């Protein structure tokens, strides 16, 4: 990925290109020492912008009337040098712990983003996490907690803002990390028995990471759409499916699906 940005000097040193400017990585290491973390905001911005543009292009091509929103998962990298370029290109945020939401709170207090940004809160909800969710909601941040189990369902009955709910779908996909994970969310039959849920706006799932085939990305979406249709019978305000799962990485030199091909199938 991003090989167009990198090159090698005549001395065999790694070099990075930003437009017509060049950074010699070896010189930076010699200047600042090791270990050295180097972040390239323009690459991050380009990747996010490209993702959003491709989705929007296929939505238009297929005459789909809905909208696409990208939520950056904070668990990937919480450094502000990484997060700020992401949200500068229109990304929303997704947290999975109280610590990550605290970082969101600090960025909001420093006025690094406006209150129109939407924050999805996944993961087990500790007392600290729950308190932060309620605090930021009171302060006007668009916070949507994703309910993962019975205790959370009971707690958020008094929550005035929008909520989502997570389904643990019984679907197996091929992924690079093809092993058993801890499961979160309600099983499909449990979910359908819940009936009406106050302020339910999102049906959420996370199927796996580094999914190796397009079929592995599309199959859970088809299942989610079926559940979505059934849940809307008692929850007409439900209007969003949160697609959770990671695209594959081609570790070997063999034919692999492209991001465009995957997005095209997802939209169709």
Predicted regions and their residues:
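A charged N-terminal "starter" segment
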Residues: 1-161, 165, 193-199, 233-235
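A short small-residue
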Residues: 24-32, 202-208, 244-251
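Glycine-rich tight-turn/loop motif centered on a GG-T
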Residues: 33-35, 115-119, 138-143, 175-186, ...
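Conserved radical SAM core fold
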Residues: 78-82, 126-128, 168-182, 207-212, ...
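Short beta-strand segments
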Residues: 120, 146, 164-168, 204-206, ...
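Conserved strand-turn element in the central/C-terminal portion of the radical SAM core barrel
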Residues: 142-143, 201-213
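Metal-dependent enolase-superfamily TIM-barrel catalytic cores that perform enediolate-based chemistry
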Residues: 152, 182-195, 216-226
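C-terminal active-site-proximal or functional interface alpha/beta core segments in diverse enzymes
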Residues: 213-268
């Amino acid at each position: 990925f991003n090989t167009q940005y990198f090159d090698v000097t005549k001395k065999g040193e790694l070099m990075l290109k930003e437009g017509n400017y060049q950074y010699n990585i070896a010189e930076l290491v010699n200047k600042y020492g090791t270990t050295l973390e180097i972040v390239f905001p323009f690459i991050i911005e380009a990747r996010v912008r490209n993702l959003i543009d491709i989705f929007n292009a296929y939505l238009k091509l297929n005459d789909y009337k809905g909208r696409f929103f990208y939520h950056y998962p904070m668990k990937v990298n919480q450094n502000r040098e990484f997060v700020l370029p992401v949200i500068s290109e229109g990304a929303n945020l997704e947290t999975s712990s109280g610590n990550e939401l605290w970082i969101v709170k600090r960025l909001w207090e420093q006025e690094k983003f406006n209150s129109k940004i939407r924050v999805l809160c996944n993961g087990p909800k500790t007392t600290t996490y729950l308190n932060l969710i309620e605090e930021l909601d009171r302060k006007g941040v668009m916070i949507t907690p994703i309910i993962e189990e019975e205790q959370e369902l009971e707690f958020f009955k008094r929550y005035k803002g929008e909520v989502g709910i997570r389904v643990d779908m019984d679907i197996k996909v091929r992924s690079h990390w093809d092993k058993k994970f801890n499961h979160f969310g309600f099983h499909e039959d449990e979910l359908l028995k819940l009936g009406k849920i106050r302020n339910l706006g999102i049906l959420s799932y996370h199927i796996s990471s580094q999914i190796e085939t397009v079929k592995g990305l599309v199959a859970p979406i088809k299942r989610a759409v079926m559940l979505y249709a059934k849940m809307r019978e008692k929850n007409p305000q439900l209007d969003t499916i949160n697609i959770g799962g990671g695209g594959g990485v081609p570790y070997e030199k063999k034919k692999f699906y492209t991001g465009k091909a995957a997005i095209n199938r997802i939209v169709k």
